[in-house]
Amino acid sequence: MDAKTDDKDGGKCPFPHGGGRGRRNSDWWPEHLDISLLHRNSTLSDPMGKGFDYAREFESLDLDAVIKDLHALMTDSQDWWPADFGHYGGLMVRMAWHSAGTYRTTDGRGGAGAGQQRFAPLNSWPDNANLDKARRLLWPIKQKYGNKISWADLYVLTGNVALESMGFKTFGFAGGRADTWEPEELFWGPEGSWLGDERYSGERELSDPLGAVQMGLIYVNPEGPNGNPDPVAAAKDIRETFARMAMNDEETVALIAGGHTFGKTHGAGDPSLIGAEPEGGALEDQGLGWKSSFGTGFGADAITGGPEVIWTQTPTQWSNHFFENLFGFEWELDKSPAGAKQWKAKGAEANIPDPFDPTKKRLPTMLTTDLSLRFDPAYEKISRRFLENPDQFADAFARAWFKLTHRDMGPKVRYRGKLVPKEDLIWQDPIPPVDHELVGDKDIAALKAKILGSGLSVSQLVSAAFASASTYRHSDKRGGANGARIRFAPQKDWEVNQPSDLAQVLSKLEAIQKEFNGAQTDGKKVSLADLIVLGGCAAVEKAAKDAGTDIQVPFTPGRMDALEEQTDADSFKVLEPRADGFRNFIGKRKQYMSPEESLVDRAQLLNLTAPEMTALLGGLRVLGGNVGHTTHGVFTERPEKLTNDFFVNLLDMKTAWSPSATTEVVYEGRDRKTGELRWTGTRVDLIFGSHSQLRALAEVYAQSDAQPKFARDFVAAWTKVMNADRFDIVAK
């Protein structure tokens, strides 16, 4: 209603003018379930078009030429943003680190995989101050090589080249990160101001899924917890935040010390003289932020944050000086020119170079979080070993850096380029390559018949297949049916996977696998991973046929079975869902979202659209996919048949819904005239009748002519989940 009418065109301008931007639906109804995240970063916002294959483009890239240009860039200091010590290495390492460092294990989101650092809010986080300059320095190279290298890959590659140009041998590099074209609206914290810290409860318990201590930081406050310069207390924050990025103590020490072997921090003057961040800047600033009125605003006068620290005597060369200085001096608290808390070496000579004046020397300085590596007992032990064994330090940093920058890429089949390391690493969730002939159509038909004749129900087969495949997270490409890791701890014991039923299904499928493979004479085999999925597909086909719909569920063999020694059980714990609306499950662990929010979150991790989510859930309900075999949301008199009954009966106006008087989060649907109990459902079920957008989708599937379309749409969504981790299919 704030929009003005354009008299000439006789319509309303979609942009707000005058008194405000106008109210959005979310302003009127802030508690309304937001399903828009299911449609972000769609092909409609991608300028490359549907036929663009980035992985193929990258493989045609002259990688040596790019690397040569990046090496030249490192020492080509620009007047508009001069390089510290005549070398951009430290700046570029920080850019790559901060691109990758947003990754968090809890939900797999963040990380370097999509080039999100160029979008809000990351491009304007306080911890990313002046990284806009690093990206602008890279623009001529990105412009030169065009679509053959993404921003996401270029950030990481630049970090690697920066390290190599300063004398460090990296572990390797993989390309293949395709750019996205709009910001990811992730939950970065509840705070409404930069550096707020309302994310803690109890004894400094950090809320899930967050991976940083304050809003706008990558990890921790370098001055200490909330600015308290206590290295031991800071170590607790470091350990927690780095663990949430999948790093153990050794990797953490190696990363901090390795990164701080290079470059400097920038606190040359009063931080209040820094201008707005990129997203808050003036139009004429063209996306550059943090314009400073202190001195020249750059070079020796640059202000990025508070501390003004240079860690080593050779900030553009790989060395062991970080540990030599850390243990070689005693440290006293000091303040930077910007007023930030930092530490200086007691009784030391000034042997640290100035970044711009070769005639000046500085005292050795450290951050509070650097001293944590000496004063935390566990970190101290590792740090002393690295001090005494520089080769171990170099190897640990190389491996940790590779893990940091590749953790969210998923399995090695997604890696591209000639610099990919040959070694398989446990955090890559390796799966053996296919080493046998795959089953053909006749074999598949025979195996389906064998599975359906095994005594396993439609519900059991569907539940096992969905449990195996639905661990997939599109965020970091982990999980999924390939590998059949559902037969290992911890997945086989998760409550959501119904361990007793699962064990029965796996036992019968393993027997079928053994019998089939033992009968072959031509080297043909079927994996258990394939059989689990095939069992679900066969059950869906049977359920559709029993409902009067003949439909074939696509199945592509080629999954392999991972070995237990290839599986880091602890790392898979984060894949266990607290809640899963598709299976009408709410776990015993603390919930951070409502059940319906958890459903949308799970759908987004599975890379589903709202229509796909709707069809999939409606089908799973009637097929008996609920955990514990509950009847909540099973709105049908024909269970284990693939009907559209869930939608028909949910939208039936003969039923009136009310909260259950005996069971929390359960609702009772009673006959409006007689009061007789007809159905029970959860919040997840009823949201498809309550939420206007989801109701519109439910209506499509509740119509009298909807059964064939529903069956097709369910099968399409089912197949998408079953194949979510089949990157080998995409590669072919």
Swiss-Prot record:
Q: Gene3D superfamilies of this UniProt entry?
A: 1.10.520.10, Peroxidase, domain 2
Region (Disordered) location = 1-24
| Segments traversing the membrane | none
Q: Cross-link Tryptophyl-tyrosyl-methioninium (Trp-Tyr) (with M-245), residue numbers? A: 97-219
> What's an example GO BP annotation here?
hydrogen peroxide catabolic process
- CC annotations in GO: cytosol
Give the catalysed reaction(s), semicolon-separated. H2O2 + AH2 = A + 2 H2O; 2 H2O2 = O2 + 2 H2O
Q: How is the cofactor bound?
A: Binds 1 heme b (iron(II)-protoporphyrin IX) group per dimer.
Keyword Cell cycle assigned to the entry: answer is: no
Q: Name the residues annotated as site: Transition state stabilizer.
A: 94
Kindly provide the PTM information from the record.
Formation of the three residue Trp-Tyr-Met cross-link is important for the catalase, but not the peroxidase activity of the enzyme.
Q: Where is this cross-link: Tryptophyl-tyrosyl-methioninium (Tyr-Met) (with W-97)?
A: 219-245
Q: In which residue ranges is the amino acid composition biased (Basic and acidic residues)? A: 1-11
Please list the residues that make up the active site. Answer: 98
Q: Which InterPro entries match?
A: Catalase_peroxidase, Haem_peroxidase, Haem_peroxidase_sf, Peroxidases_AS, Peroxidases_heam-ligand_BS
Cofactors that this protein relies on:
heme b
Query: PANTHER family in the record, alphabetically?
Result: CATALASE-PEROXIDASE, HYDROPEROXIDASE I, BIFUNCTIONAL CATALASE-PEROXIDASE
Family, as annotated: Belongs to the peroxidase family. Peroxidase/catalase subfamily.
Official protein name in the record: Catalase-peroxidase
Q: Which organism is it from?
A: Rhodopseudomonas palustris (strain HaA2)
